[in-house]
Each structure stands twice: as C-alpha cells, then as structure tokens.
C-alpha cells in the first residue's frame, strides 16, 4: 500500500480529519470560484461593456450638473465632458477669473448654459453655502461632482503636520464635501421626483488610493479620504431608493497640480483620460470589486486595486510598510529640493 493510500485510509477512519479535509476542499473551491467571478467581472467592466449613456442622468434634457473644484485639472475635465454630454454646468471653485474663462469656453464649445460660484472651500463660511444655494435655486440638477480636495504639500509625519494644513485638509475634503452635498442633493432628489423617476440623479465623490491604503506620511489626507469611502457607501444606501446613484471614485496618480506630476504614462493618466474612464463606467466597480458604491475606473488603477485587494490586502503590514518607505523617500527628496531652492535664493540676495 502506497503512502498516499495509507493517508487516505487514515483520514477515512478518523471522522474529524475527514470533515476537516472536506471543509478545506470546499472552502478552497469557494474561494477559487469567487476570485474567478470577481476577475471575470473586472475584465467585463473594463474592456467589454459599452460606455454609460448619460441620458439616464438627464443629459440633453435641459438639466444641470454641479462641479466643485472646477477651475483646473480633473474638475475642469468633469465640467467639459459633462457639458459635451449635454448638461448645463454650475462651476464651483475658488478663483473667479478661472471660472469665467471656463464658463466662456463651455458655452461657446457645447452651447449649454453655465453659472459660476466663487467658493473658498478652506473656509467653513456660511456665506459660501448660502451663495451656492441661491445659485442653484430652481435649477433642474441631476448631477453633483464632489471634486474639491487638498493633500499635504509634501509627505509629512502626522506629529509634524502644521495646524493650518491639517485644518484645511479636513475642512476641504470632508466638511465642505458634506455641506455642499447637503445643499445640492435635495435639488437632485426634487428633479428626479419631478421627472417621475424618468431620469436618475448622480453624486460622484473623488476618493484616492491614499484613502484605500492607510498611508504613512499622509496620515491626515489618508484618513480624510477613507472617511469619504464610508460616507459615500452610507449615502448610497439612503439615496438609491430616491432614484439617486452615489459613488466614490478611486484614483491612483493623475497628472495634476495636486499630484505635482506633469507627464502621463501607462499607469498615470492625464485628467482627460481619467474623467473619460469615470463617466464611461458610472455604476460599475471595475477594480473595486469587493466594495459597495465604489468605482476604480481607469484600467491601470483598476488592475492595481484588484491585485492589492486579492493578494496582500489594503490593511496589511506589507502594504503599510511599502507605503511608508515610498513616502519617506518622497519626503527626503522634497526636503532636499526645498533646501536647494532656499540656498540658491540666499545666494542671489548676497
């Protein structure tokens, strides 16, 4: 009798060992099956399904979208691409002059209406929200893009984070996002109800890999984005019965002023590419296969997200250590650049 036969005979004679082996085999089959289904869903979402038709969100029917952080980068692209789809745009951002230029560009290119609201999200000022409320009064709004956000100027230990930077990040990323949503969402619900649910509403909020993965040296920013994950999922549960889809959009690096990256690459899209992938796949999960009301839309980011979730895990010590080492290195290089600039400036004065 071979050793394998002896092992099988031993297991068969021991009920506990038999059931343990059976359970292990069934569990293994279950895990393999669920992984295969998630991977298949990832491929279908990313590469097979057609782009979402925005007529379901009221495009080309005289409806409006509100876009925050609209003057530059990703926010500007959201405004342009939503206007191209036939939505009039309320542009919300800090710099009036930039908003005016963008409003002119949108109106001339896409023949839709625009409104502008100069809004400093770093100041939790009641006047800001009253002005926004006045601007959208009686408008048939179907879409809100919560794009306004701020990160650290450079990676920094939490205990060394300046109080102003800490307050600004929380105020902009969290307080302003929630309060703007409280102002705009009732208008979206009213528009959906008025249409007798012939159109749906949509609220997209920008998340980040920094919130997906706890990120040392960006602790405040990381926490602020993780908060938006839980908030968006909870809000999705509340508003879905009212005909409003709520989704957190997760991105890795995108070329922008905030990321300080200028050149796009295979894994780093420009704002136009990123927003196009987002609007084309609203309602799908792409890389966020295990998360409710969450989408990682850009294909390279989606594959990275899926790989991390299904290997080491986002909350693992391995992921945390890799993040720690990466951002510590970025901080070291940034401090050297600051030191060099300061030295050159001092030499010029002399």
UniProtKB/Swiss-Prot annotation:
The annotated active site, in chain numbering, is 221 (proton donor), 225 (lowers pka of active site tyr)
Q: Which UniProt keywords apply?
A: Endoplasmic reticulum, Fatty acid biosynthesis, Fatty acid metabolism, Lipid biosynthesis, Lipid metabolism, Membrane, NADP, Oxidoreductase, Transmembrane, Transmembrane helix
Does the keyword Endoplasmic reticulum belong to this entry?
A: yes
Q: State the organism named in the record.
A: Lodderomyces elongisporus (strain ATCC 11503 / CBS 2605 / JCM 1781 / NBRC 1676 / NRRL YB-4239) (Yeast)
Q: Where is the signal peptide?
A: none
Taxonomic path: Eukaryota, Fungi, Dikarya, Ascomycota, Saccharomycotina
Q: Which reaction does it catalyse?
A: a very-long-chain (3R)-3-hydroxyacyl-CoA + NADP(+) = a very-long-chain 3-oxoacyl-CoA + NADPH + H(+)
UniProt-recorded name of the protein:
Very-long-chain 3-oxoacyl-CoA reductase
Compartments annotated for it: namely: Endoplasmic reticulum membrane
Recorded topology in the membrane: Single-pass membrane protein
Cellular component (GO) terms are: endoplasmic reticulum membrane
Q: Which PROSITE patterns match?
A: ADH_SHORT (PS00061)
* Protein transport in keyword set: no
